[in-house]
Amino acid sequence: LDGVEEAEGAWGTDVMCGSDDALKVLHLESISEEFNRITADEGIIPEKSGQILLDSLFAKNRGYKVGDIISVSEDGDQNLLKKTSYEVVGIGSSPLYISFNRGNTTLGSGEISGFGYILPEDFDQEVYNQIYIHVHSAEKVISYTDAYETLIEKMQKRVEGIEKEQCAFRYDEV
């Protein structure tokens, strides 16, 4: 696609975690090789299936420490994960979350309380449900400016322009 320097597929899903009286929504994301590199402030970045790096703010607020086991549950008939519990091997940060706001969801209260990163093989999906795109020349434009927003919006329209064609291709493939 014209204007794309690099792209990488990823997986992500929202899950519930915690005790019944204090369930919170956690966004789980697959660890990327090239995009949005996470940092472990404590412990390590997951190296094996069943390991998780937790959001430092979420870990602090919920009392999680390296070595703890965190249990998660998916919504209804959603089966995107191979596991329902993970060992916390790291606590850290992600460039995707630079403010206190972790996003919105259709689960629980509608607010995501934190994020966690797991290995791609812990997702039980054949097809990516997210994509990260490095837009040509985006690094030369200051983030959050009108020029940056215009550049990204143009790329978003190009990607959306091929969506139906790609969905039909995938449908025929299956």
Predicted regions and their residues:
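Membrane transport/envelope proteins' first extracytoplasmic loop
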Residues: 1-174
